């Protein structure tokens, strides 16, 4: 029996490559999967790793009427040619264009997976435009999937769509491979030995080695942040908290993993502090964050807004408790007092900055320093809570069951 054709769309190939790793190969067992995105150099990686056909479509993330109309026409022609049973999209611009084009091409099933809602951090006219884009995308979709319960509630509260909404499994776009995201596997991969032979002593020695290479001592309490080093990830508040804590606790350290971007760039004084403070170690972007998570004692993730963030899940799978803000996704992954701590969110429902979270962040980070037994208890809970809810295979099977319900 011929397999139904399924087209998965993201705006750029970096999302197709990073967000959907392994999932497309899994789905290709049951459907004829095509990946569609703008090729910025990673589309061939997707093609080879996932074993699927990929098509380059010149879509841009930012609003550009001429380029958007051109991309819309290309998508329409592609869908008319390929005649897919379903077009399933995520990322804002790719979703907007592909849902309209799929509707015009009479694709039977048009699925929009809503991850982050960009308008939540915007104001004025831009906020209105971004909300309108979400409404249009949802209106042209036959099915809308919120990535988590927080996104679901926001879509309803902001009257983005009246369509029925249901989160797949416990949420998240791709789940986590907890076999790969484990201390034992990390040591095995880096020492080139079988994970079955890795002992607790091997893991302790490896952690100590990585800490030493990063300039940390056994007495240091190391917080780690992973992500874009930008304002809406809470970098201003995190730098202020670290300044205060460094005066009180000379052995507190911050390990920063990620890129410093020009868009939403941090202020000069924050930039200088994060690069020059002896209490901060900046290592830039890393292809494998597992050794850095092993070197840390806790994740700090004071983001302003998310859809369903991957970093707290990765940290949890690596046995780290987390400090997060009370925002979509983060407050689903973390259960306050069980596998981390939740502090107030800086933005209200209209994207206005209503709370300076610096005092709460400082207080909570200091609580971690003062309560090693509680931190250890939350650490023991962390991995189990990720495995129970976000194991990758469970997320994939949940998505497959959703697809089959539409056949």
Regions found by a protein language model. Give the residues of each.
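N-terminal strand-loop element at the rim of the active site
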Residues: 8-67, 154-158, 165-167
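A conserved mid-protein helix/loop that constitutes part of the nucleotide-sugar donor-binding site
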Residues: 17-22, 221-244
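Short, structured helix-loop element that forms part of the nucleotide-activated donor/catalytic region
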Residues: 43-48, 253-279, 283, 374
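Donor nucleotide-sugar binding/catalytic pocket of nucleotide-sugar-dependent glycosyltransferases
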Residues: 55-56, 135, 139-207
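Short His-centered aromatic/hydrophobic patch
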Residues: 89-95
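A short, well-ordered alpha-helix in the C-terminal region of glycosyltransferases
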Residues: 209-212, 367, 374-389, 395-400
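Aromatic "clamp/platform" in nucleotide-sugar-dependent glycosyltransferases that forms part
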Residues: 285, 304
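Short hydrophobic beta-strand element within catalytic cores of glycosyltransferases
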Residues: 321-324, 334, 342
């Amino acid at each position: 029996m011929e397999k139904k054709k399924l087209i998965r769309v993201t705006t750029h190939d970096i999302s197709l490559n990073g967000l959907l790793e392994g999932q497309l190969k899994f789905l290709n067992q049951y459907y004829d999967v095509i990946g569609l995105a703008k090729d910025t150099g990673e589309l061939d990686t997707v093609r080879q790793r996932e074993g699927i056909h990929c098509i380059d479509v010149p879509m841009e993330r930012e609003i550009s009427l001429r380029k958007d109309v051109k991309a819309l026409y290309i998508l329409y022609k592609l869908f008319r040619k390929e005649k897919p049973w379903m077009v399933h999209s995520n990322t804002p611009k790719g979703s907007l264009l592909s849902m309209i084009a799929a509707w015009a091409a009479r694709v039977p099933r048009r699925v929009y997976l809503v991850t982050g809602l960009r308008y939540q951090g915007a104001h004025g006219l831009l906020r209105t435009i971004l909300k309108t884009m979400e409404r249009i995308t949802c209106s042209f979709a036959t099915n809308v999937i919120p990535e988590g319960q927080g996104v679901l509630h926001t879509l309803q509260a902001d009257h983005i769509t009246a369509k029925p909404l249901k989160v797949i499994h416990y949420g998240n776009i791709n789940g986590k491979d907890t076999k790969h995201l484990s201390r034992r596997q990390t040591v095995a991969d880096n020492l080139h030995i079988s994970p079955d032979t890795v002992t607790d002593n091997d893991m302790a020695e490896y952690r100590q080695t990585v800490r030493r290479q990063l300039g940390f001592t056994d007495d240091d309490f190391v917080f780690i942040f992973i992500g874009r080093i930008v304002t809406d990830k809470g970098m201003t508040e995190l730098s202020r908290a670290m300044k205060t804590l460094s005066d009180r606790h000379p052995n507190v350290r911050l390990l920063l993993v990620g890129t410093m971007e020009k868009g939403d760039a941090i202020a000069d004084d924050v930039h200088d502090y994060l690069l020059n403070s002896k209490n901060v170690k900046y290592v830039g972007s890393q292809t494998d964050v597992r050794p850095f998570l092993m070197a840390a004692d806790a994740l700090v993730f004071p983001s302003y807004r998310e859809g369903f963030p991957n970093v707290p899940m990765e940290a949890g799978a690596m046995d780290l408790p987390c400090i997060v803000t009370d925002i979509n996704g983060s407050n689903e992954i973390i259960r306050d007092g069980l596998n981390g701590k939740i502090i107030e969110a800086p933005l209200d429902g209209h994207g206005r900055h209503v709370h300076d979270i610096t005092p709460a962040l400082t207080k909570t980070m200091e609580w971690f320093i003062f309560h090693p037994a509680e931190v250890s208890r939350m650490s023991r809970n962390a991995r189990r809570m990720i495995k129970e809810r976000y194991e990758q295979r469970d997320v994939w099977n949940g998505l497959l069951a959703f697809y089959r319900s539409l056949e």
